[in-house]
């Protein structure tokens, strides 16, 4: 159900939550920053992911009227939220805005002098690149990463400090089948229960996509891996071959993720 932005009371509630977080933690040494909202689905992401089909509502009646968030709404939300929490934050804290999966549309946003310590967060996944037509080969991934991830981050770094706040090594090639953009048994797909590649072959694939993606993130101001630990047992649960690549701990243990820096 995606109707939050249509309800002023719910929008105001989120603003008050952000205010309370800023008041409570705004001067804590351990706080780096506050992200105003996670992954607002703008029109492009809504259509690409086919949200209503990918995540079918439990209550269809309640979900009627669900729609993507508009650029106009999210821009106003960010401006209002900034004004409401900035005064509670010490000067070394950051306010983070998510790009809504439209990284390059923010060039004219928050250009005024008053907006300080604003970071632009982008979430980039190879599974979404596959949905955009990226060839499911190491060479295809590298081409897409260079032409899109790297190019766009370098371009937007001129306007904001850019972080890749979510990414991982997951890709359909290593899974051995087209995951249709990272869909699983939870979406009604069978998944894979038998490995397609040897451990050494998988290691080569993952090391390659790790290297190319880290080179792209280096064009910005930093990155955060999606998850340190994945609770799903991908070994003993049917249909989950390849999903251990969402788990940074496993990626390091298996030698897939380089620890050079």
Language-model regions: role of each:
Residues 16, 23, 30, 41-211:
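Extracellular glycoside hydrolase catalytic/binding regions
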Residues 1-36, 82-84:
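An active-site-proximal structural segment forming one wall of the substrate-binding cleft
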Residues 37-40, 101, 226-232:
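Short, solvent-exposed turn/loop segments enriched in Gly/Ser/Thr/Pro and often Arg
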Residues 4, 32, 46, 106, ...:
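A residue-identity detector for tryptophan
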Residues 9, 51, 172, 251-253, ...:
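Intrinsically disordered, low-complexity regulatory segments enriched
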Residues 28, 89, 217-220:
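Alpha-helix termination/capping residues and helix-transition junctions
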Residues 186-261:
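Aromatic-rich peripheral "rim/lid" segments of glycoside hydrolase catalytic domains that contact
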């Amino acid at each position: 159900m995606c109707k939050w932005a249509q309800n002023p009371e719910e929008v105001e509630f989120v603003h008050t939550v952000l205010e309370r977080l800023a008041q409570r933690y705004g001067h804590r040494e351990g706080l780096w920053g506050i992200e105003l909202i996670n992954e607002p689905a703008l029109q492009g992401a809504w259509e690409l992911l086919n949200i209503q089909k990918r995540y079918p509502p439990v209550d269809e009646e309640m979900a009627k009227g669900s729609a993507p968030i508009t650029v106009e709404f999210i821009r106003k939300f960010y401006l209002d939220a900034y004004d409401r929490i900035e005064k509670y934050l010490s000067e070394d804290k950051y306010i983070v805005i998510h790009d809504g999966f439209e990284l390059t549309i923010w060039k004219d946003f928050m250009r005024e002098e008053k907006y300080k310590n604003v970071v632009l967060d982008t979430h980039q996944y190879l599974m979404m690149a596959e949905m955009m037509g990226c060839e499911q080969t190491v060479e295809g991934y590298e081409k897409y990463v260079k032409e899109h991830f790297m190019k766009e981050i370098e371009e937007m770094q001129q306007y904001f400090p850019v972080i890749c706040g979510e990414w991982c090594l997951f890709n359909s090639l290593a899974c051995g089948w087209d995951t249709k953009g990272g869909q699983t048994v939870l979406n009604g797909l069978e998944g894979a229960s038998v490995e397609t590649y040897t451990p050494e072959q998988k290691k080569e694939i993952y090391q390659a996509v790790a290297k190319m993606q880290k080179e792209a993130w280096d064009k910005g101001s930093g990155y955060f891996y999606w998850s340190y630990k994945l609770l799903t047992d991908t070994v003993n649960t049917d249909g989950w071959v390849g999903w251990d690549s969402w788990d940074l701990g496993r990626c390091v243990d298996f030698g897939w993720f380089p620890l050079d820096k």
